[in-house]
């Protein structure tokens, strides 16, 4: 990382789609595992915000392909002390993809002493859902924070990550999603512990993007008892529970399963034996497994997805310049 990045103390982090999860993950890492401070701000928050909101801060944008709307934030870079872009797109890749304006924007970023942090996979756009970029973005954020001198975040080795990336969904969950899709398609509950609940957006969105189902609601274990449980008791729906390696978490899982089964609701537990900053890799892999199995079984057309080419009024709110 450049000295300007390493010397940054306050960050404003943004991203949308699967990149929202990466941005929130980085904010968690910076706030809890370094002596620095970060705030997540959705892209629309950059449209009319006064420049004074951003003074003396570093802007961090996550966008796998530097989507048009990610450029809303990047165009506000002049109001920040420094800018960092996490992306799979390089000037060369953008040129090859026939996007010269985007290539020039990336060159301008670097010529103005901004920093481009690359992660795979460039041009992962044949299908609506993405599998490589979402996982790689978490790792890029973790490696980024690991370069700060006071970082307390773990830097995983290949031997640690490999078994997590081979995680599978329980057979009963795969079977239920394949053979009883109507039980899940209208939405279900995704229950997990903090801090995962703060950066689990892509775990939910993969069902919306991969299967075109209603995005499941995300609840922290203790939050689940404050409304979501009562609502699903009135209108039964399944719950998928994510369990890491914490002892307190194990008790919350047991209590959640007992509550759900007590009202006749289906509960499926995905267990990943890793701490929160690493278990996200296992949960991504396990839910990818479930989604991919259901996509195959239900013959979902991921190339000609619903609404393709009809979203530009908002997707292209900020055109390439």
Q: Can you annotate each of these PLM segments?
A:
Residues 1-9, 113-235, 313-321:
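Active-site phosphate/pyrophosphate-binding segments
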Residues 225-228, 249-251, 276-281:
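Short active-site-adjacent structural elements
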Residues 28, 32, 205, 209, ...:
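Short, well-ordered alpha-helices that flank and scaffold nucleotide-derived cofactor binding pockets
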Residues 17-21, 25, 132-139, 194-198, ...:
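Conserved active-site and cofactor/substrate-binding residues in soluble primary-metabolism enzymes
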Residues 51-52, 97-98, 227-230, 281:
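Short secondary-structure transition/capping segments
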Residues 34-38, 211, 215, 302:
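Secondary-structure boundary/capping signal
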Residues 261-321:
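Charge-biased C-terminal accessory regions appended to nucleic-acid-, cytoskeletal NTPase
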Residues 6-158, 235-273:
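Glycine-rich phosphate-binding loops that contact phosphosugars or nucleotide phosphates
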């Amino acid at each position: 990382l450049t000295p300007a990045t390493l010397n940054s103390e306050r960050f404003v982090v943004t991203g949308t789609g699967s990149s929202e999860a990466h941005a929130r993950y980085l904010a968690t890492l910076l706030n809890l595992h370094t002596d620095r401070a970060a705030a997540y701000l959705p892209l629309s928050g950059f449209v009319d915000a006064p420049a004074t909101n951003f003074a003396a801060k570093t802007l961090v944008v996550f966008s796998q392909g530097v989507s048009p709307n990610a450029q809303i934030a990047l165009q506000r870079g002049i109001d920040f002390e420094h800018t960092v872009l996490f992306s799979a797109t390089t000037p060369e890749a953008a040129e090859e993809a026939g996007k010269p304006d985007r290539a020039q924007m990336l060159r301008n970023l670097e010529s103005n002493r901004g920093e481009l942090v690359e992660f795979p996979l460039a041009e992962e756009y044949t299908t609506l859902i993405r599998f490589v970029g979402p996982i790689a973005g978490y790792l890029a954020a973790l490696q980024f924070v690991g370069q700060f001198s006071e970082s307390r975040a773990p830097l995983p080795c290949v031997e640690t990550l490999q078994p997590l990336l081979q995680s599978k969904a329980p057979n009963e969950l795969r079977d239920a999603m394949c053979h009883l899709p109507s039980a899940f398609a209208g939405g279900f509950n995704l229950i997990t512990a903090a801090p995962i609940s703060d950066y689990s957006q892509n775990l939910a969105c993969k069902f919306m993007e991969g299967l075109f189902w209603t995005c499941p609601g995300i609840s922290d274990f203790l939050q689940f008892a404050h409304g979501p449980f009562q609502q699903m008791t009135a209108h039964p729906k399944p719950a998928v529970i994510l369990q890491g390696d914490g002892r307190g978490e194990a008790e919350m899982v047991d209590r959640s399963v007992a509550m759900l089964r007590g009202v006749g609701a289906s509960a499926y537990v995905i267990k990943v034996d890793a701490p929160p900053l690493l278990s996200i890799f296992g949960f991504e892999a396990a839910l990818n497994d479930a989604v991919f199995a259901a996509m195959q079984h239900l013959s979902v057309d991921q190339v000609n997805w619903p609404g393709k080419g009809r979203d530009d009024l908002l997707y292209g709110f900020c055109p390439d310049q």
